[in-house]
Amino acid sequence: MKAWESNIRKVEPYVPGEQPKVQDVIKLNTNENPYGPSENVRKAMEAIDIDRCRLYPDPDVTKLVKSIADYYGMDNNQVFVGVGSDDVLSMCFLTFFNGKKQVLFPDITYSFYSVWADLYRIPYEKQKLDDNMKIVPEDYYKENGGVIFPNPNAPTGLLMDLDSVRDIIEHNKDVVVIVDEAYIDFGGVSAKDLVNEYDNVLVVQTFSKSRSMAGMRIGYAFGSKELIKALNDVKFSFNSYTMNMTSIDMGVASINDKKYFEECVERITATRERTKEELTKLGFTFPDSKANFIFATHKSVPAKEIFEKLKDLNIFVRYFAQPGIDNYLRITIGTDEQMDKLISALSEIVG
């Protein structure tokens, strides 16, 4: 080993869902929205003055922060915006989890959590889900250095009711509690209003799922003005200009089109419920997802076999080799046509 190699920070990186390099695939593996952004977003993109590219974007992201704050009934100083919710969450780990006590999060959850904890040298302890794959609030009563969990959880899709979320917060008033709501729009009640009751709570959301803008990388957090200031202080210590002007303008256009947003979410949730019925007929079982995906296992055919056979048909779903969930597939909800093709393929595979 070379001498300088001992100074390299080594981590096990996050592995994203496969991005197919071929055309004509049915892509149901990364929980993207099957429908494009609203017409308002297209118009905003066309209206962008190319001459503005020579200028730095607004470091405070003022227009987008105000639009998000107005939409959700928050003050501007209660909103933080970042380059996708991954950026926001990473900043949260770096900003708020700096003690010697272990940060708590579920053992089956968004796998980026352990990556960030390892990267930033944060001690952590994973809490097991129960036999029904549910988060157990009582497991988060113990002494800790912070708490984070998704709601709905990923990859299970299970939603925790707001009373249970509040219960976890009530037992953790001395640390920062982060509720990751990437999928909340598909069937849950947001915990966002709790930031007005608890000054230690952050609620993180994204434009990537319900607003069809994964490619523009827009995430945001709600919290007390003290928490938001702390996040901005850390952000400006890395990069003053995290959001590009295109994302800012298109984000404003998206958040202001409530009608399209609601129609799009309604279409996806209707397709999800129909897909659940069809999967059940084929012998699949799954938690009752309230997200834009279904986490399914088959009674007799191994998940990896199904995954590989679907891939041969250019249908991409997500397979996890992680113990405990290595016989499950996470299936993103696509268009009705895409899901019909998936069901047809599955009927041939599982027979």
Ranges and model annotations:
Residues 62-102, 300:
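Phosphate-binding glycine-rich loop
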Residues 200-280, 284-287:
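PLP-dependent aminotransferase class I/II
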Residues 268, 281-313:
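Conserved PLP-binding catalytic core of the aspartate aminotransferase-like
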Residues 163, 309-318, 322-351:
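PLP-dependent enzyme catalytic core of the Aspartate aminotransferase-like
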Residues 125, 130-185:
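Active-site phosphate-binding strand-loop segment of PLP-dependent enzymes
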Residues 1-55, 143:
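N-terminal "arm"/small-domain region of PLP-dependent enzymes with the aminotransferase-like
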Residues 95-116:
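Conserved PLP-anchoring active-site segment centered on the Schiff-base-forming lysine
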